[in-house]
Amino acid sequence: MAARLYCQLDSSRDVLCLRPVGAESRGRPLAGPLGALSSPSPSAVPSDHGAHLSLRGLPVCAFSSAGPCALRFTSARCMETTVNAHQILPKVLHKRTLGLPAMSTTDLEAYFKDCVFKDWEELGEEIRLKVFVLGGCRHKLVFAPSSCNFFTSA
């Protein structure tokens, strides 16, 4: 079983939001490089937030009806895809954090829609899930592969 999420660009805040499909909530904005850091309050994620639905590599807040509170996962092994062949994405996000010219938010949105979610949802490649923490989520991972390299912008 896979958690189904979709991303939606909020151009007024330059934030890419991840939201659960069919959820009533508006979701949580991404942290760090794509917008202002938004620390979840203790009530933002209910105590029964779907840990029983755990999927390798996803933090427990990914299953909250409020949506995940920071971008932290990708189905691309070691962040490498046809679009991102040499670990370019972490460098791009780091440049954006520093306010330097980098990939536009529209390009980032296309990357996640076309590469990450296509591999994850359509191909169902759960085994390849890797976790990259890009901001201040307080939630622990359900499972993190020992070979996973973490990139943090915060």
Curated annotation (Swiss-Prot):
Residues 68-117 are annotated as: Mitochondrial targeting sequence. The keyword Transferase does not apply. Pfam families: X. One of its GO terms (cellular component) is host cell nucleus. Transmembrane segments: none annotated. The keyword Signal does not apply. It comes from the Viruses. Signal peptide: none annotated. Keywords: Activation of host NF-kappa-B by virus, Activator, Apoptosis, Host cytoplasm, Host G2/M cell cycle arrest by virus, Host mitochondrion, Host nucleus, Host-virus interaction, Modulation of host cell cycle by virus, Transcription, Transcription regulation. InterPro entries: Transactivation_prot_X. A fraction may be phosphorylated in insect cells and HepG2 cells, a human hepatoblastoma cell line. Phosphorylated in vitro by host protein kinase C or mitogen-activated protein kinase. N-acetylated in insect cells. One of its GO terms (biological process) is viral genome replication. It is found in: Host cytoplasm; Host nucleus; Host mitochondrion. Multifunctional protein that plays a role in silencing host antiviral defenses and promoting viral transcription. Does not seem to be essential for HBV infection. May be directly involved in development of cirrhosis and liver cancer (hepatocellular carcinoma). Most of cytosolic activities involve modulation of cytosolic calcium. The effect on apoptosis is controversial depending on the cell types in which the studies have been conducted. May induce apoptosis by localizing in mitochondria and causing loss of mitochondrial membrane potential. May form homodimer. May interact with host CEBPA, CFLAR, CREB1, DDB1, E4F1, HBXIP, HSPD1/HSP60, NFKBIA, POLR2E and SMAD4. Interacts with host SMC5-SMC6 complex and induces its degradation. Interacts with host TRPC4AP; leading to prevent ubiquitination of TRPC4AP. Interacts with host PLSCR1; this interaction promotes ubiquitination and degradation of HBx and impairs HBx-mediated cell proliferation. Belongs to the orthohepadnavirus protein X family. This is Protein X. It comes from Hepatitis B virus genotype A1 subtype adw2 (isolate South Africa/84/2001) (HBV-A).
